[in-house]
């Protein structure tokens, strides 16, 4: 064995040791962080066993949307009548988009609490867990996607909120899935009133003419997934 091979052997034996030391350092750092900032539930702030999680009670209260649901609108069915079904609503009034998916029913409870904190309380760190649920719920859409685009805020609303929660979610979904995103491809050119409390027809009328594709966005011919929080 020459000097070079001996050195290589020493490095080979040292690599696992370095990894063990690194793993130990990470565990110690995590323990110190948990002591200073104990992990709490994202929704109710009850104690949890790790950061970025829901407590068992809030997790049970999340009304995740699972199949069976309308393949077009993503709205859940009361009974399982088979795969690939379209709801009467989607057949009577077909939407302009191809398919929609949602994580959970947006009712009083953890889902509403998390979205409101992300939107109105500067809790940008909530984008990570919410985006992970969105990536799971929209897996079939994401599999066919060429590009992810967030629903934009009007400049005045963006100034008041300081960040666009849909853009934060889009960026995180892109990071998780490897799908490319363009956070500036769509522009909101008209200020609109809040969609809260509006019917479907009123919502459509409210946003009529409010959006425009940015010049040079290059989305023609692409399969685009539009991302929003609600």
Model-predicted regions and their roles:
Residues 1-230:
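Glycine-rich phosphate/pyrophosphate-handling loop used in enzymes and phosphotransfer proteins
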């Amino acid at each position: 064995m020459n000097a070079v091979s001996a050195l290589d052997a020493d490095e080979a034996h040292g690599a696992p040791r370095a990894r063990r030391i690194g793993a130990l350092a990470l565990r110690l750092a995590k323990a110190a962080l948990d002591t200073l900032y104990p992990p709490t539930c994202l929704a109710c702030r009850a104690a949890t066993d790790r950061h970025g999680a829901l407590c068992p009670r809030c997790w049970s209260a999340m009304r995740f949307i699972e199949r069976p649901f309308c393949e077009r609108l993503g709205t859940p069915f009361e009974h399982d009548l088979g795969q690939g079904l379209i709801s009467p609503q989607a057949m009577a009034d077909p939407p302009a988009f191809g398919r929609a998916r949602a994580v959970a029913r947006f009712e009083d409870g953890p889902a509403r609490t998390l979205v409101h904190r992300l939107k109105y309380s500067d809790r940008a760190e909530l984008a990570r867990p919410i985006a992970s649920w969105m990536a799971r719920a929209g897996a079939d859409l994401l599999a066919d996607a060429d590009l992810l685009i967030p629903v934009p805020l009007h400049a005045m609303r963006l100034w008041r909120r300081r960040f666009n929660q849909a853009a934060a979610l889009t960026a995180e979904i892109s990071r998780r899935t490897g799908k490319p995103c363009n956070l500036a491809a769509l522009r909101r050119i008209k200020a609109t009133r809040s969609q809260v409390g509006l019917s479907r027809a009123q919502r459509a009328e409210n946003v009529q003419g409010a959006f425009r594709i940015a010049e040079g966005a290059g989305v023609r011919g692409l399969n685009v997934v539009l991302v929003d929080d609600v």
